[in-house]
Each structure stands twice: as structure tokens, then as C-alpha cells.
């Protein structure tokens, strides 16, 4: 083993290639000189502008066969002999046939991981190693980076200060901790097997992250409990930060002979399941937020994987998404319900966890033959109406009253006049969802990512940070922890490159909301047709198909066609043919009256809502200091009838909901009219 040192660069440990197919081409591109990076830099999505096509499973198989490399076809990875392991190391292990096949190659991305040496790299790195030529030059592949010295010291300091619950000197303190975390029925033996400790100073449970195959400590997760009016809320802190914390809690207890595993979203649930069923259990490091592809090799050995992630529809949707990564044919899902709560709650309620596991539904079926396969899904939506409506905005309550929420698999088209603040509004719109755990990918083709990030950081802090630079690091650290990613594209790009990047983001980062700003700037290089309208229709159709196939919400910003300044924009004002509005599930229009009357109000109009048909208009107020939109404080007035284009008064909504009307009747939120004057408000209001 040898070390590579660079001035002003972090220490990198590399492992020389061993075995029959050793390459000799120099270092991988990941070690090329470049600017020093921060310790916890959020990875930018790779730009696909370069002539590098995404690899397919067929291409990987053909490449391995062409170079005489044996491989085994797995569920989500291909297994091959590892060139990073000395043959004597393999002989020292148990002589199982699959033991030497410890190199896992992801079928979707081509990324590889050696389970024995922990060497990893991209598909291009692996190709360079196989095809390399040269005399005497040694090839190296980057090992998965361990924690830096500062992080390692902090991990050891906390771990050494933490003690097992049963060793607490005060029995009342131990009992209080058990009650606080719901562990009254979890035995000391279970806590001991999973090496769970308790940090008295922080009143937190401590869950360890051990290096696979050894007892080395790589990180920790601290779980604190805060009392709320509606129960206990758990607060998680990971060391290192969430983006690099890849701990499958319970992995050291898994043996090679295990063929079935139950996957949970919380460590507490894994404790309850293991104790009640005796089955192997694993807990995902970031719960229902994402399943990093780096963890897939550790799940390859299982023939059956049961997801029991939680008791709400969001957990159910996450389970279905994760099953697609792992091959749905081997996955089963525990449906949320009154008699099927979280595993820990089920244990505390005296329910039979093995019985609940037997009710798990297969994640894959060839076809729907009758209502029988759908009835439980329908019941779930009827029983959880608010959750079925999607994630609700915290900054735009009137948008919740109209759209009800942000749902996966939908296409939203957003338009507004030039200079009205479309990008500023849609950035806050997406940021609101991102702060609630909606993994978001931004494709900004008109303005740079630096400028966009500056706007979003200002909106996140709700203050101008240029006037408070001493607080920048604090807010930047909090902003960096958001599940937010940016495409590195700028200007005109082909739809194929953009879709490839979006699919990569969905697979690697579990992105469920993509923002494209905007369509006209992106489609400049589209050579599908000389007819610009036809090209736009094709692109809109591609985004529609992507949203449906990947269960990912796509928000598409489109400039309107040229209209007179004294006229309001309509759905027909969207540039191009009617295909954009036809394909869209939601159509949002930012109406800007200041272009006609001078400085004035802006309104957000929901002109299409496929979910339940409610449409309407509500006012916005722009705060220049925080770059945010908010509802004017004086808008707390009754709903008013407005006239349609024919001068007829729209009928009152039959739903009776404030701020909502069915598809054609629009409702405007405005001030109460004076009692001495008739109500003369119009839809432009």
C-alpha cells in the first residue's frame, strides 16, 4: 500500500491493483489536480455535455466478456473477481465459490466497489485499469475515504463518553431514558448485541457505524428526544454529516448465509424487529429520504427484502421507490395501517410482529387483473387524505388550499411575464419543499448556479447575508445539509443529456422534484426538428414521460408568448402549442400588474389542477430584503365572486373550501369591499 500526498490536498490512500487484469495507466481522473475542496462538499451532478454516453447493463456485460473477466449476474449489481485482493487473501478465507467474486459493479451506473479492500471508483476508472498499458507503472484506485482526523477524534471522544443503558448509576435515569425512547420492552441483551449506548450529557442514544469486516469505528448517529404537544419528536445528528454517513445499522450481525432481511427507516425499529422475530434487520442511514447506491452491494446476498419503513403514506411511497432500485421481484412491502404501525410501536402495543410481516405485499406484479390488487391502495388514500395530497408548503398556505400539496409523478408548468420574478418565486417554492425533505434537483439554464444558490441562501436565511457576513458560515452549513443538488449545465442543452442527468439523480440521490428553468434556454440546441413548436412539444412529452416513469415531480418554467401589457396571461399564453398545458397536471401563472399600473401587487393564479380541480388566484408580496414572496397581511378577507370572460358571475364553489373553486370558476382572495360600495372586483385583481 502506498500514499499519495499533495500540498494543500487531503491525504488520499490508494491501493495498487493486484490479480490477472492489472492496468497500468496512471491515476483515475478523481485524483487530477484541482482546487482544494471543503471537508463536506455536496457533490455536483456530473454534466453530460461531454461525449460520454451513460453505460448500460448490456454494455458492461459485453465489456467484461470481451476482456475475459468472469462475472455473476445479481439483482442490482454484477459480481466479478476483484483485482484489488491478493490471491492468498482469498485462500485464507472460507473456500466458498462466490468468495472471490467480491467486486460489485452497479448495473445502472457502472460504479464498482470491492467488498474486501473497500476500493471503489467509476466505470471509467475500471475501464482505464483494464485497458491500461505501460512498463512498470503502478495503477491505483481510490479507497473509500475514512473519516478525517478531526472527525475521527470527535467520534472516539463521544463513543468513549457514552455508556450502556444498563450501566447507568441511577436506575431512575435509565428508566426515564427507556420511556423517552420507547424502549421499555427492548431488553438489555438486544441493546448489547447492537452495541447501543447512551450519552448522558446530551440525553441521546448513540448508534455506532463500524467498518464492514472489522471493528473499526467510522461514525456515529446520536438520537435525541424532544417532548411535543402531540408526542415525542426524535432529532438525529450524524457524525460525519448525512451526505457521507452510509451506515446500514445492524450490518455486522448479518452472516453470509442470511437470505432474508427486514429493512427499516429507524434504528429503534430494527431493535424491536430483531428481538421479536429473530430475523436479520437493517436500518437505512437517512430513513425514507434516500437509499444511496453505495449501499446496494451489501444487499445483494438477500433473496427477499421486506421494507417496513413507517406508518404513513410517505414511507409507503419511499418503500416502492427503493424496491425499484433493488429489483422489485425480490422485495415486499408492509403497508401502513391502524394494526400495522412502526415495529417499535407494534412491540409496545403487544402486536405480533411476525404476523404483520406475513401480510407484506409483493412490490412487483405483472399486471392488474381486478380491483382486488387495488383495493388496499384505494383504502390507504381514503384513510390518509392529507398524506395522499402530498407535501404541503409551509410558506404558501393559500397554495395548499388550491393544490392541496406537492405530489410525485406530476408535471407542473409555471409561466409569467418577463421580469415578474419567476425564478425568484420558483426558487422559494422549491426551497420550501426541500426544507421538508423533498430531494430536489435544480436545472438552471438561464442564470448561473452561483447566483441561484445566493438567492436561495438569502431566502433560506430570510435576511441579506451580505450585511451579516459573520453569520454566513452558520447559514451555509445549514443550507448545505439540505437535499438540494444542481445540474452543471448552463445555456442550451439537448433533451437527451438533460433526461440522462435527471435519471442519474433519481437513481443516485433519490431526487423526487426536478426544476427546469427554463424551457426556451434549454432547447436551443435541440435539432429534432426545424419547427420550434414541434421540438418544444417533443421536449414537454419527454418530461411528462420522465415524471410518470420515475415517480418524480417535474416543474417546468416556460416563457409566455408576447401579449399586450394591459392583458392578463391565460393558459393559452404559454409559448408553443397547447401540448404543454394539456400534458401538465398543474398550471401556475405569476400575474404581475405592476407592468401596467406601476409598482403594485403580484398574484399567483392556479389555472389547472388535475388532482381535484380547485383553481383560483391569491396575492403575493415581494420582500426585497429577503427575496421572498409572502401573503399580504391585509388579505385576510372573505372570498369574492369574480366575473368570467363573458361577464357572468362565477358560481360559488360546491366544495365550500376557502380559497378554492372548481375547474372553471376562479376565486380571488382580496380585501373586503367597502359596505358603501358594490363589489366590482375582477379576475385581474
UniProtKB/Swiss-Prot annotation:
In its UniProt record, which GO terms are filed under biological process?
Answer: DNA replication; mitochondrial DNA replication; mitochondrial transcription; protein hexamerization
**Could you tell me which residues belong to the region N-terminal region (NTR)?**
54-214
Q: Where is this region: Contributes to single strand DNA binding activity?
A: 1-122
Q: Which InterPro entries match?
A: DNA_helicase_DnaB-like_C (IPR007694), P-loop_NTPase (IPR027417), TOPRIM_DnaG/twinkle (IPR034154), Twinkle-like (IPR027032)
Q: Where is this region: Maybe required for stable oligomeric structure?
A: 406-591
For region Primase-like domain, the annotated ranges are 215-335
What membrane topology does the UniProt entry give?
Peripheral membrane protein
Region: Disordered, residue numbers: 642-685
**What tissues express this gene product?**
Ubiquitous with the highest levels in the liver, heart and kidneys. The skeletal muscle, brain and testis showed lower but detectable expression. Expression is coregulated with MRPL43.
- What is this enzyme's catalytic activity, as reactions? ATP + H2O = ADP + phosphate + H(+); Couples ATP hydrolysis with the unwinding of duplex DNA at the replication fork by translocating in the 5'-3' direction. This creates two antiparallel DNA single strands (ssDNA). The leading ssDNA polymer is the template for DNA polymerase III holoenzyme which synthesizes a continuous strand
MF term (GO), any = DNA helicase activity
- The EC number(s) this enzyme carries: 5.6.2.3
Please give the coiled-coil regions recorded for this protein.
454-482
What domain notes does the record hold? N-terminus enhances protein stability and hexamer formation, which is important for DNA binding, and is required for DNA helicase activity and, ultimately, for mtDNA replisome processivity.
Subunit details for this protein?
Homohexamer (via C-terminus), which assembles in a ring-like structure. Homoheptamer, which assembles in a ring-like structure. Homooctamer, which assembles in a ring-like structure. Oligomers may sequentially eject two monomers (octamer>heptamer>hexamer) upon DNA binding. Oligomerization is Mg(2+), nucleotide and DNA-independent, however, Mg(2+) and nucleotide stabilize the homohexameric form. Interacts with POLG in vitro. Interacts with LONP1.
Query: What's the name of the protein?
Result: Twinkle mtDNA helicase
Amino acid at each position: 500500500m502506498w500514499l499519495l500526498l499533495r500540498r494543500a490536498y487531503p491525504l488520499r490512500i490508494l491501493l495498487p491493483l493486484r490479480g490477472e487484469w492489472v492496468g497500468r495507466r496512471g491515476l483515475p481522473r478523481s485524483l487530477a489536480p484541482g482546487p482544494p475542496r471543503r471537508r463536506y462538499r455536496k457533490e455536483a451532478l456530473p454534466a453530460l455535455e461531454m461525449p460520454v454516453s451513460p453505460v448500460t447493463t448490456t454494455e458492461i456485460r459485453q465489456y467484461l466478456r470481451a476482456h475475459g473477466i468472469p462475472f455473476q449476474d445479481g439483482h442490482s449489481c454484477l459480481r466479478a473477481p476483484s483485482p484489488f485482493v491478493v490471491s492468498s487473501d482469498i485462500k485464507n478465507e472460507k473456500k466458498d465459490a462466490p468468495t472471490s467474486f467480491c467486486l460489485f459493479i452497479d448495473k445502472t451506473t457502472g460504479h464498482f466497489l470491492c467488498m474486501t479492500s473497500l476500493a471503489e471508483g467509476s466505470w471509467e476508472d475500471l475501464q482505464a485499469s483494464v485497458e491500461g498499458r505501460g512498463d512498470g507503472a503502478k495503477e491505483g484506485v481510490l479507497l473509500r475515504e475514512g473519516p478525517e482526523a478531526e472527525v475521527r477524534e470527535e467520534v472516539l471522544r463521544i463513543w468513549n463518553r457514552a455508556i450502556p443503558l444498563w450501566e447507568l448509576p441511577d436506575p431512575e435515569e435509565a428508566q426515564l431514558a427507556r420511556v423517552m425512547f420507547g424502549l421499555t420492552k427492548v431488553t438489555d441483551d438486544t441493546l448489547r448485541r447492537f452495541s447501543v449506548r447512551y450519552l448522558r450529557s446530551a440525553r441521546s442514544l448513540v448508534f455506532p457505524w463500524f467498518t464492514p469486516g472489522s471493528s473499526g469505528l467510522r461514525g456515529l448517529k446520536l438520537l435525541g428526544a424532544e417532548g411535543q404537544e402531540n408526542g415525542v419528536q426524535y432529532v438525529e445528528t450524524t457524525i460525519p454529516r448525512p451526505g457521507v454517513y452510509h451506515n446500514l445499522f445492524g450490518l455486522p450481525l448479518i452472516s453470509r448465509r442470511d437470505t432474508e432481511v427486514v429493512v427499516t427507516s429507524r434504528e429503534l425499529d430494527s431493535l424491536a424487529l430483531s428481538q421479536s422475530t429473530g430475523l436479520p434487520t437493517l436500518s437505512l442511514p437517512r430513513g425514507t429520504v434516500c437509499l444511496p447506491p453505495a449501499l446496494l452491494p451489501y444487499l445483494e446476498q438477500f433473496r427477499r427484502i421486506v421494507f417496513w419503513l413507517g406508518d404513513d403514506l410517505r414511507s409507503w411511497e419511499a418503500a416502492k421507490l427503493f424496491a425499484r432500485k433493488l429489483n422489485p421481484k425480490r422485495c415486499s412491502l408492509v403497508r401502513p395501517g391502524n394494526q400495522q404501525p412502526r415495529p417499535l410501536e407494534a412491540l409496545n402495543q403487544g402486536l405480533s410482529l411476525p404476523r404483520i410481516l406475513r401480510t407484506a405485499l409483493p412490490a412487483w406484479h405483472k399486471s392488474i387483473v381486478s380491483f382486488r390488487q387495488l383495493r388496499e391502495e384505494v383504502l390507504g388514500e381514503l384513510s390518509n387524505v392529507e398524506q395522499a395530497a402530498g407535501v404541503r408548503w409551509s410558506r404558501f398556505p393559500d397554495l395548499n388550499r388550491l393544490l392541496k400539496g406537492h405530489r410525485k409523478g406530476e408535471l407542473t408548468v409555471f409561466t409569467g411575464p418577463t421580469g415578474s420574478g419567476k425564478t425568484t418565486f420558483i426558487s422559494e417554492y422549491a426551497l420550501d419543499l426541500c426544507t421538508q425533505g423533498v430531494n430536489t434537483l435544480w436545472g438552471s439554464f438561464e442564470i448561473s448556479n452561483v447566483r441561484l444558490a445566493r438567492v436561495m441562501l438569502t431566502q433560506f436565511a430570510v435576511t441579506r447575508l451580505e450585511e451579516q457576513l459573520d453569520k454566513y458560515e452558520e447559514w451555509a452549513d445549514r443550507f448545505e445539509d439540505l437535499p438540494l443538488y444542481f445540474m452543471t449545465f448552463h445555456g442550451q442543452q439537448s433533451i437527451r443529456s438533460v433526461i440522462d442527468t435527471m435519471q442519474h439523480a433519481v437513481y443516485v440521490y433519490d431526487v423526487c422534484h426536478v426544476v427546469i428553468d427554463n424551457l426556451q434556454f434549454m432547447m436551443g440546441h435541440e435539432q429534432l426538428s426545424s419547427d420550434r413548436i414541434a421540438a418544444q412539444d417533443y421536449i414537454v412529452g419527454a418530461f411528462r414521460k420522465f415524471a410518470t416513469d420515475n415517480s418524480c415531480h417535474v416543474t417546468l418554467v416556460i416563457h409566455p408568448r408576447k401579449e399586450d401589457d394591459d392583458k392578463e396571461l391565460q393558459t393559452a399564453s404559454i409559448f408553443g402549442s397547447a401540448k404543454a398545458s394539456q400534458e401538465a397536471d398543474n398550471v401556475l401563472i405569476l400575474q404581475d400588474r405592476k407592468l401596467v399600473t406601476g409598482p403594485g401587487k403580484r398574484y399567483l393564479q392556479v389555472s389547472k389542477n388535475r388532482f381535484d380541480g380547485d383553481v383560483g388566484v391569491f396575492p403575493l408580496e415581494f420582500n426585497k430584503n429577503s427575496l421572498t414572496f409572502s401573503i399580504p397581511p391585509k388579505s385576510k378577507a372573505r372570498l369574492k365572486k369574480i366575473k368570467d370572460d363573458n361577464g357572468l358571475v362565477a358560481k360559488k364553489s360546491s366544495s365550500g373550501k376557502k380559497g378554492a373553486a372548481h375547474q372553471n370558476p376562479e376565486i380571488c382572495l382580496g380585501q373586503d369591499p367597502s359596505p358603501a360600495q358594490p363589489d366590482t372586483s375582477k379576475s385581474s385583481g
